[in-house]
Amino acid sequence: MQNIKSFMQFPASKKVYVEGSRPDIRVPMREITLSPTKTETGIIENEPVRVYDTSGPYTDPDFQPDIQKGLPPLRKRWILERGDVEEYEGRPVKPEDNGFRNGKQSEITLPFERKPLRAKKGKTVTQMHYAKRGIITPEMEFVAIRENIDPEIVRQEVAAGRAIIPSNINHPESEPMIIGSRFHVKINANIGNSAVTSSIEEEVEKMLWAVRWGADTIMDLSTGKHIHATREYIIRNSPVPVGTVPIYQALEKVNGVVEDLTWEIYRDTLIEQAEQGVDYFTIHAGVLLRYIPMTVNRTTGIVSRGGSIMAQWCLAHHEENFLYTHFEEICEILKTYDIAVSLGDGLRPGSIADANDEAQFAELETLGELTEIAWKHDVQVMIEGPGHVPMHKIKENVDKQIEICKGAPFYTLGPLTTDIAPGYDHITSAIGAAIIGAYGTAMLCYVTPKEHLGLPNKDDVREGVIAYKIAAHAADLAKGHPGAQRRDDALSKARFEFRWNDQFNLSLDPDRAREYHDETLPAEGAKVAHFCSMCGPKFCSMKISHELQKTVREEGMKQKAKEFVENGSSLYR
């Protein structure tokens, strides 16, 4: 892996911290330094621009990263001082946790020495539990500063179930963030190995790469060997919440034979991942036996991996989905560690032909029912959504979700707005993501150019994250989120003043912006030129606008001088 600190840095940027009500609440931000504006009358300084920062300690000059040691436990003191958790031995790691059986063992030895925490008997340790009792936790204050919003609003939104702060007590390394319609639209990046490709180092590097470009959460969707070890390395080194789909690992434990899945194996997998520090689980508890026939005449059937696994299990056993029948027990586990549940849309449409159909909305009704059960346990909930939806059908998805799930945060995969662009589905889906985000969706799951084609690599992760940062920011602008437009205004001003380096540095992808500019005008002098290669020096509209403004100012001065003479050379009448 290349030097972490070097590839995590952004140009003309520095890490700054805003301190809260206590010294250990230090909220990170990235401050972008701007060059001054040069005018005919002198120099005007431009204030630096502070932006939301997901890069964690990796961009702090005082921090020396070591993947073998992980990140410092930022939240550990906050967790322990509440007095409602206890340390315990935890379950031993088994060969099948890493995909091995028949006596074989993983050759990977984990370097992290830690014992897991859990709630003391009779205690609930979720942020929702505290919020309902009127407590503003350090985590809530942290996100309030990050979002430039009052901490009491954060508490109210979490208490009402309209926002979640994913924060497993066994992932103290994560910096608190919030998912809800009143806050910045967040994005998730999926990573993870498969049975045919990738390694632990590659997945850790993908995680770092994703948070460098702005991913707010990570989902580890590993399905190959070393699942447990891969996840441990990712969590210990992740400054953002980590989610998983536990049914994937449970299926690996039975060698991929769906019929052999049991509640006991799934429950053991939940506890295994809870002890590691997974912050939210996608659980496909809404795929009910009676809904499966509704998918038979679909163009693309059931496209969710988790949904198809549970549908196959239900049909094989002629029984109801065990995730549904054991949901109360699942909530008992979740509230013991403060793991949020992301209620999976196992029957989401996989083509625009199937959008908003009977199966999709039948499952949504069940997710609404499960939301209320989770809230009864003070478990934080978000609802997963589609998928593939043409633009004119997007609003109906949001309206139904808000009504049925009582305002629980909506978390959507796109949606893709057309099916004809394999290789460009980061674009087809970012269109839908911007629209659904503007309507109130709280988090957008990115789609990479490799969607439907293969496992994304590091470059695909970058493309997907940037596409979705654009969509999320566009949605923030549409929602009128406080301060969202400041970066746009700063970049527009830099563009009009031909401050090329400031334009690059204020952009979501400074490297790409600089690279494209320098393909045709690489000389350093071009960074102050009043034109680019698109129009050249004679046809640049902004250069012409400057000349027009200068002319108007000069004409205005001439007019004022004329009025001065006509008024008897008196300043006052």
Curated annotation (Swiss-Prot):
GO annotations of cellular component type: cytosol
Residue stretches in coiled coil: none
Keywords (A to Z) from UniProt: 4Fe-4S, Iron, Iron-sulfur, Lyase, Metal-binding, S-adenosyl-L-methionine, Thiamine biosynthesis, Zinc
Free-text remark on how the cofactor is bound: Binds 1 [4Fe-4S] cluster per subunit. The cluster is coordinated with 3 cysteines and an exchangeable S-adenosyl-L-methionine.
E.C. no: 4.1.99.17
GO biological process, one term: thiamine diphosphate biosynthetic process
InterPro entries membership: ThiC (IPR037509), ThiC-associated_dom (IPR025747), ThiC/Bza_core_dom (IPR038521), ThiC/BzaA/B (IPR002817)
Catalysed reactions, as listed in the record: 5-amino-1-(5-phospho-beta-D-ribosyl)imidazole + S-adenosyl-L-methionine = 4-amino-2-methyl-5-(phosphooxymethyl)pyrimidine + CO + 5'-deoxyadenosine + formate + L-methionine + 3 H(+)
Residues reported to bind substrate: 190, 219, 248, 284, 304-306, 345-348, 384, 411
Residues the entry annotates as binding [4Fe-4S] cluster: 532, 535, 540
GO molecular function, one term: 4 iron, 4 sulfur cluster binding
Pathway: Cofactor biosynthesis; thiamine diphosphate biosynthesis
Residues reported to bind Zn(2+): 388, 452
Domain of life: Bacteria
UniProt similarity note: Belongs to the ThiC family.
Function summary: Catalyzes the synthesis of the hydroxymethylpyrimidine phosphate (HMP-P) moiety of thiamine from aminoimidazole ribotide (AIR) in a radical S-adenosyl-L-methionine (SAM)-dependent reaction.
The protein's name in its UniProt record: Phosphomethylpyrimidine synthase
UniProt source species: Geobacillus sp. (strain WCH70)
Source lineage: Bacteria, Bacillati, Bacillota, Bacilli, Bacillales
